[in-house]
Amino acid sequence: MTVEQKFGLFSAEIKEADPLAASEASQPKPCPPEVTPHYIWIDFLVQRFEIAKYCSSDQVEIFSSLLQRSMSLNIGRAKGSMNRHVAAIGPRFKLLTLGLSLLHADVVPNATIRNVLREKIYSTAFDYFSCPPKFPTQGEKRLREDISIMIKFWTAMFSDKKYLTASQLVPPADIGDLLEQLVEENTGSLSGPAKDFYQRGFDFFNKITNVSAVIKPYPKGDERKKACLSALSEVTVQPGCSLPSNPEAIVLDVDYKSGTPMQSAAKAPYLAKFKVKRCGVSELEKEGLRCRSDSEDECSTQEADGQKISWQAAIFKLGDDCRQKSYWGARMPTDRILRLPASQDMLALQIIDLFKNIFQLVGLDLFVFPYRVVATAPGCGVIECIPDCTSRDQLGRQTDFGMYDYFTRQYGDESTLAFQQARYNFIRSMAAYSLLLFLLQIKDRHNGNIMLDKKGHIIHIDFGFMFESSPGGNLGWEPDIKLTDEMVMIMGGKMEATPFKWFMEMCVQATWLCGEPGPYMDVVVSLVTIMLDTGLPCFRGQTIKLLKHRFSPNMTEREAANFIMKVIQSCFLSNRSRTYNMIQYYQNDIPY
């Protein structure tokens, strides 16, 4: 019945979102079938067969018929006889092992039935490997059981004197550079409301960005601040428009008092806040097409749903090369100011966003925040500000205590539920960013580039040094992972503490996920390879070779775990992290 009704093991596969193509309507998350009933049922069948093969030929015939109906000779078709999700691997191969046991017991007299059943068993086994590999979503106990089942199937298959090999070929992504041509073709084909929507959006954004050019001639200080507020007050909100850094929300209003010039005298970036209504890309397009540039009344952007309305901060900049310097502005109480956009930052954030989608897809409870950086033209761009965040640098300027003291004052002592939840958030974000710091070799990790949000997550920003570049003339002084004493204190104070063991366990899980046994290493390597010809300073000839080595390819699970554990141990309370913080304090007045 479960075969005909497509339940459990025989259910149709739910297509999971590709981490490389995640969208509002297609969020990456695991979609395993419910196979627990089949686990129980097949266990019963295995136990029953051990009795039936000695005493009941009728029951053996029923078993043979059941197996024949449950399996198929088809391999790799769009609709397989069984679900190919990794969560269904246990019951699938347990059923196949039962089939081999029936053949080996020599209780099926008909040779034709035996041969067909044997072929169906092998075809069903091959069929599982006809789809791209996936990372396990099962719990630890169930995963161990599934691995044990696979070993038993291999043993049974080996005794059957049949050898199966499978070649899994993942074709490279077909990536071309036809973007400019596509943009010209698309914009040239616009007319009517669509063209008005396009022109209205770019006109609004150009006016917002041009404030940077207006304030550039003014000296830093009160004069530039006044010029910024004056220029911002002349910007009128266009109906149905969005920010490039936040295309899922309609801009309702501008906080004309929020204009804040950054510290850079030459580039003149500034921060502004906008009231936005989050509605999704599809709804925004509908709203934009309903609006007319000469009539805001026709645009249905009523502020009916208060939960969808919020204030969003962003940084705008109009100037020349935006790659050479970092910009830090007046320290905001709720939103943090990030460095200006660059191709290198965008590459790092693309990879971080990819890992975020991968973590969601495989059900790994890790946290990263890939804030958006959009380069709109050479030297021009907009950056999404991280809400409800404070930098470790800002924390040091406002108070005289470290991160651990901040946690105890903010969330209570270690026995409180609030502290434990914040610590858990800290650990799962530390594990994710530690893996990324190691894989991408992200450097310049001073306290100005480390953030804490109100939930306890740690967030890294500013990726000006990565791969084969590092501060101080590429000295490579900093360790692979930043694990300072205050970070360790939050995670228990020592490596033997339970919270720190959680951290190491999460790092090991994430490392094994990203290594060669999973399908994701090639995706990251390909993404970096595409950028090699850009001339970014982080590429010095050995980037891909060293990146592949850090992924610990060709290692067993145990070897990969030992590999990342040694990295963590070598970075634990490293003096190089502390001395780098001291250097930043004396050179750039960044507290530590």
Swiss-Prot record:
Annotated region (Activation loop), positions in chain: 460-484
Region span, Pleckstrin homology (PH) domain conferring phosphoinositide binding specificity: 180-318
Gene3D superfamilies attached to this UniProt entry: Phosphatidylinositol 3-/4-kinase, catalytic domain (1.10.1070.11), Phosphatidylinositol 3-kinase Catalytic Subunit, Chain A, domain 4 (3.30.1010.10)
Any one GO biological process: phosphatidylinositol phosphate biosynthetic process
Keywords assigned by UniProt, alphabetized: Kinase, Transferase
One Pfam match: PI3_PI4_kinase
MF-aspect GO terms: kinase activity
Sequence segments annotated as region (Catalytic loop): 441-449
Region ranges (G-loop): 281-287
Domain of life: Eukaryota
Stored InterPro entries: Kinase-like_dom_sf (IPR011009), PI3/4_kinase_cat_dom (IPR000403), PI3/4_kinase_cat_sf (IPR036940), PI3/4_kinase_CS (IPR018936), PI4K_N (IPR045495), PI_Kinase (IPR015433)
Domain PI3K/PI4K catalytic positions: 275-576
DNA damage is among the record's keywords: no
Leader peptide range in chain numbering: none
The family this protein is said to belong to: Belongs to the PI3/PI4-kinase family. Type III PI4K subfamily.
Name of the protein: Putative phosphatidylinositol 4-kinase alpha-like protein P2
Species per Swiss-Prot/TrEMBL record: Homo sapiens (Human)
Phylogenetic lineage: Eukaryota, Metazoa, Chordata, Craniata, Vertebrata
Gene designation per UniProt: PI4KAP2
